[in-house]
């Protein structure tokens, strides 16, 4: 099969300011349009944030302000169908915008024009022979070096690719050999992500695979299966999540080694079948897309800022009302920032280091007692000792 035919009706929903907006989805009912099915990737144009493109088994779709604008298929674009003139199988499994507003996408099974860009009504084909017969090219990522990464997520031809956008050169990896020169087998590559240190992570059925920053530009990069020491008096170690089939990866900025294992049995997670993960960088909220719906977990790590100013450092909830019993979060901090919380007359009640770009406080002093009503000052400094900014928290008891 070219791809798994899930027969899921197309649906795009946008959560903003605690309200859901549902994108137009009844346009496929017009004569001649294919079924609007199995949409699996979306991205917003960074130059026109109200414009969204979506793709999947039935081609490419453009929306603006939630309204359907255009469907791209074999009859109005370079895209081709796997089955001749069947619009239900114009397979576009991944897309992404670059910082200049250019859309990058790959049309699986297109022998002539598989790697494509689209901008301002103009299509450009950057075809690559190695991609001409691959059935499930997906998971596009443009990293901090302007390298385009993607994978063929198919058990018959598992591979990942790096495309040098500046020089139109493609590098492929089809043999999987780790840092110990041990060959390992993987059948699926479900996700690709970059971390804050500019390493690349691959989600595979053999576990997470790391490509260190220094390896990312090499023609044959070393693949690292991260080892976790057993700490049992031996020199033995186990691979991080070795043998666990990883379906999605999201990376926050906290650089911590602590691992939580959530299941539908020990948490409110809706299902153990995780299809996607995304993090709200501003708040640290982690969203899990499952086969039974969407749920979220409030972590205490958000995106770091290089500079802490009054414009990007703030606390929530604020004010803290009498019936609130959760944690108070200060966000917008730099990596491992020093945080001190003091009373209006300078008495220290709490201090610590940021976790990623956030710091959480339980509203208690150093004796474990709830602090009284009042205005509390949050003083910040960088990890190097440079003064940051100050924000205020109002507590009402």
Question: Residue locations for each model-derived region?
Answer:
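Terminal processing/anchoring signals of secreted or surface-associated proteins
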Residues: 11, 301-306, 315-318, 346, ...
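Glycine-centered tight-turn motifs at strand-turn-strand junctions
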Residues: 348-371, 382-386
């Amino acid at each position: 099969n070219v791809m798994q035919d899930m027969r899921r009706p197309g649906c795009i929903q946008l959560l903003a300011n605690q309200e859901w907006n549902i994108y137009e989805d009844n346009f496929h009912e017009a004569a001649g349009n294919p079924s609007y099915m199995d949409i699996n990737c979306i991205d917003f144009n960074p130059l026109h944030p109200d414009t969204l493109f979506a793709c999947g088994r039935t081609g490419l779709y453009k929306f603006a302000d939630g309204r359907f604008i255009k469907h791209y298929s074999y009859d109005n674009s370079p895209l081709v169908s796997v089955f001749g003139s069947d619009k239900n199988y114009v397979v576009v499994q991944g897309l992404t915008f670059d910082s200049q507003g250019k859309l990058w996408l790959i049309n699986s099974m297109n022998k002539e024009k598989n790697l494509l860009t689209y901008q301002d009504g103009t299509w450009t084909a950057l075809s690559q022979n190695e991609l001409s017969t691959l059935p499930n090219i997906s998971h596009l990522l443009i990293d901090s070096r302007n390298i385009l990464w993607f994978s063929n997520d198919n058990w018959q031809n598992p591979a990942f690719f790096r495309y040098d956008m500046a020089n139109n050169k493609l590098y492929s990896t089809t043999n999987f050999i780790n840092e110990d020169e041990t060959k390992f087998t993987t059948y699926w590559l479900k996700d690709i992500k970059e971390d804050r240190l500019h390493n690349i992570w691959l989600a595979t059925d053999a576990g997470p695979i790391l490509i260190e920053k220094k390896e990312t530009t090499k023609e044959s990069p070393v693949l690292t299966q991260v080892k976790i020491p057993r700490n049992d008096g031996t020199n033995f170690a186990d691979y991080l999540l070795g043998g666990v089939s990883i379906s999605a990866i999201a990376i926050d900025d906290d650089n911590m080694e602590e691992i939580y294992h959530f299941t539908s049995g020990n948490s409110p997670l809706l299902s153990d079948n995780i299809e996607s993960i995304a993090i709200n960088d501003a708040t640290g909220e982690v969203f899990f897309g499952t086969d039974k719906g969407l749920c979220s977990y409030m972590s205490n790590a958000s995106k770091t800022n290089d500079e802490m100013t009054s414009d990007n450092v703030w606390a929530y909830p604020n004010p803290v009302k009498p019936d609130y019993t959760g944690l108070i979060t200060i966000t917008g901090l730099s990596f491992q920032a020093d945080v001190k919380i003091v009373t209006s007359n300078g008495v220290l009640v709490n201090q610590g280091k940021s976790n990623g770009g956030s710091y959480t406080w339980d509203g208690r002093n150093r004796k474990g007692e709830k602090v009284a009503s009042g205005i509390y000052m949050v003083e910040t400094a960088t990890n190097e000792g440079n003064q940051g900014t100050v924000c205020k928290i109002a507590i009402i008891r």
